[in-house]
Amino acid sequence: MKTFYVASYGKGNDKGIYIVSFNEETLELKKIQQILTQDFPSYLIAKNKELYVSYKNAKSNNEGGGLGSFSIHKNELILNNNYSSSGRSYTHLCISDDNKYIFAANYHVGATAAYKLENYRIDHKIGAVRHTGMGPDLLKRQTAPHVHNVGFTPDRRFLYAVDLGADKIVMYNYKDG
């Protein structure tokens, strides 16, 4: 039996985060738990018995979007906290190896954000860097920055942000803090 997590943009009571089990012998899927969310969960990371989620703003104002942190207890998710990004919608996340920081890619405004984690909770926003530039396809998707992925280089010396809109990879020196 394997357990995994699903983020859903569903409508009404279908929206949220699901815990699903998969029986490899019978090929049966079973919904274990659903957590209804106000915003659209768009990306999930499970690490160290914690689940981190990025939310796409589902509201027409700047109150939604952001990050969430859940503790994983057997087959149940328990909310640690949510942290609003004031309408910003993150599309990808990564966590530092020491579990002190979470980094977020914001496709819609073309920015990379950093948050401090404290006891696996999202404590506060450290800052954000807005990207600049355009890519070669000025008639469609590359008229402005669109950061869609963040991660660490294999040697962990740099945080990178892949920017589809600006058609570049931005490298940030990474040091603890």
PLM regions with names:
Residues G10-N13, N57-N61, H108-A111, A166-K168:
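Short glycine/acidic-enriched loop and turn motifs that connect beta-strands
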Residues L77-H148:
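Asp-box/WD-like beta-propeller blade repeats and closely related beta-sheet repeat scaffolds
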Residues A7, S54-K56, A105, V162:
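Residue-level marker for isolated small/hydroxyl-bearing positions within beta-strands
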Residues G16-Y18, G65-G68, A111-A113, K168-V170:
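A short loop-to-beta-strand structural motif that recurs across blades of beta-propeller domains
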Residues S21-L27, F70-E76, Y115-H124, N173-G177:
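Short loop/turn segments immediately following beta-strands, especially the blade-tip
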Residues A46-K49, I95-N99, P154-D155:
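Residue-level detector of Asp-centered blade-edge/turn motifs that repeat once per structural unit
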Residues N13, D39-S42, S89-T91, H146:
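Beta-rich catalytic cores
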